[in-house]
Amino acid sequence: MSNNGSSPLVLWYNQLGMNDVDRVGGKNASLGEMITNLSGMGVSVPNGFATTADAFNQFLDQSGVNQRIYELLDKTDIDDVSQLAKAGAQIRQWIIDTPFQPALENAIRDAYAQLSSDDENASFAVRSSATAEDMPDASFAGQQETFLNVQGFDAVLVAVKHVFASLFNDRAISYRVHQGYDHRGVALSAGVQRMVRSDLASSGVMFSIDTESGFDQVVFITSAWGLGEMVVQGAVNPDEFYVHKPTLAAGRPAIVRRTMGSKKIRMVYAATQEHGKQVKIEDMPQEQRDIFSLTNEEVQELAKQAVQIEQHYGRPMDIEWAKDGHTGKLFIVQARPETVRSRGQVMERYTLHAQGKIIAEGRAIGHRIGAGTVKVIHDIGEMNRIEPGDVLVTDMTDPDWEPIMKKAAAIVTNRGGRTCHAAIIARELGIPAVVGCGDATERMKDGEKVTVSCAEGDTGYVYADMLDFSVKSSSVDTMPELPLKVMMNVGNPDRAFDFACLPNEGVGLARLEFIINRMIGVHPRALLEFDDQDAALQNDIREMMKGFDSPREFYVGRLTEGIATLGAAFYPKRVIVRLSDFKSNEYANLVGGERYEPHEENPMLGFRGAGRYVAESFRDCFALECEAVKRVRNDMGLTNVEIMIPFVRTVDQAKAVIEELARQGLKRGENGLKIIMMCEIPSNALLAEQFLEYFDGFSIGSNDMTQLALGLDRDSGVVSELFDERNDAVKALLSMAIRAAKKQGKYVGICGQGPSDHEDFAAWLMEEGIDSLSLNPDTVVQTWLSLAELKK
């Protein structure tokens, strides 16, 4: 390539590797590294070239502009937003007005001619790559510019000049000062890369780790129609996919969860080559919003590439990808170290102690809670209105906003997904953010007090008023040994990756009710008899089941995703999934449910559990649950998932439900399947040995056992003070159940509320020889440590 003396001014990507970060910056070095080392492993990266740091430094030196720049920066107060804006604009104009040295212009001309020799109409992406960018402990995400659909040599030259100027964007200047980088020690490289025609297909961002929890056994992929800049900027709410790495490696279906984004707009090529106007934004037709922007096969192919890249770099990675609309081929266009989760941190657990009126909801970023005064900011000119501790509410945050984002107690946006700039910066700053709310700027009013909670799963909520919350920190590397296993009760798959990072020995109770309620929301019979519903109900259901081929597939598919997420999060530890235990009033509350459920005076003691599964009126609904379990265990290979049957009243019912499961293809012992019974009715303990003939063990439900042993309605405030699992009658029944299971060499655990609430009860169960305690996640560490103290 062209030289100036001994140092090249331009280098091809295939000449570069990670040893060249100081010459071409992290972004360009990484592209070169992948082309050189991973192209034989199925990772496709479009070719290109990069100007070097030497070229940039010579450009500043030979023109003398560098002295003016550093003198101006030295006397600028970076924390004064208006002073910073004025200095930044002046510096960028100086750079744009300075001509390139002839040697650099000729070097770019030669490289451009080679890169476009096969297609004179080829379009290019011109990106910045700072020499301090994408170091693992500093996210320079988006602080320099990217220009897309740049065609022709003159347009490329203009774009490179603007990329050089972008080293002195306001946000980049501010970031360097706050991170302790010297302006003189940072240079810029411009990367010129052939464009992938994702304007005709889809593109997005993926991480080889879950960005919220740090769980490293999944790849998290976001995708939307058109050029990827919309996803990166947070201008669009993208589709989201989680892929389980061990299942992928086994060659099985590995997508554990899919969430459809609204994808209202896309960025495409514009007809003009006027600088900065080469792309345009257009609305998406409704039919494309209502389908996923990637097929399942493409999602898995991208995940494989992410795993290859992660294995090569030996660390979690943040990767931008694009699909070519002409060929259908998937390309990697950027890869950098994931910068927030890979730092490691003390475990923090935020808990909200009150519920308020929900004003807005969207995607939760992080797991924290923040509260403060709302400031609705419509454009960057209003930045000076934000005071420390305010809640910043806006349509979407451009990276230019970073200087004020760090002042906020929380951030709320109308648009954006979990991989947009607002999300990346919020994570880095440790500020809770709720993105993609749709209409937060209309619902939230300037000056009102709110609480922003990201501590309740994937969905973040904005509540009216300043609500009470607490935070617990714990740094537990190794837990003491106990004579029993400490497991967890988990219902919400959204929290599974987060909870899996706590000390645990699996899941003793995974409830299907949460999945049915929150991820489906429709009565199974209303879906099976979809054609019989009235037009209004059919429309409601169609809206809920977008992305699925049929009402039946919606129910089975969503159940499969929920169970698979729980199974994958704790794999290979056992995850005991209790099949549905809704009462008739709870089923009636589902969409379309009232038509199919009896009205019962006391649903707690009515049509529920095993009796429902074998009833003619529910058998085909139960078959949907069985189908989901089979997919998770047999197709995906998550055989750590076991099933639990609730509320088995009689031994005859036990026999009938085991026969029904076998009829549905879930036979005890087949493919290692274990079937556990909830021991929660006095008859279960009194006839424990007979019940155990049909099951592989017991899981004690102390809540129902207490209410039925003492004749209490646990939902009645009048008698609630008598409700206590530690009552001698209850303990006598539990002892019988534990002894019977021990005698037969079968598993016995407990998943009721008791051990989470009462450490003395947990200690008594340990003395009785129970195999496991399944606790609420927030009590796991404390109960584990206190039981270890007792054993000393």
Name each model feature, range by range:
Residues 66, 326, 338-343, 347, ...:
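Acidic, glycine-rich flexible loop/linker segments
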Residues 1-191, 200, 286-297, 302-304, ...:
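N-terminal beta-alpha lobe that positions the nucleotide/phosphoryl donor
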Residues 112, 120-125, 130-140, 144-148, ...:
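Conserved alpha/beta-domain cores
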Residues 142, 314-339:
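Conserved metal-phosphate-binding beta-hairpin within the catalytic cores
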Residues 214, 450, 704:
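Small/polar (Gly/Ser/Thr/Ala-rich) solvent-exposed segments
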Residues 218-318, 323-324, 363-370, 388, ...:
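Conserved catalytic alpha/beta cores of large enzymes that bind or transform nucleotide phosphates
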Residues 138, 148-150, 159-160, 202-211, ...:
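Beta-strand scaffold of nucleotide-dependent catalytic cores
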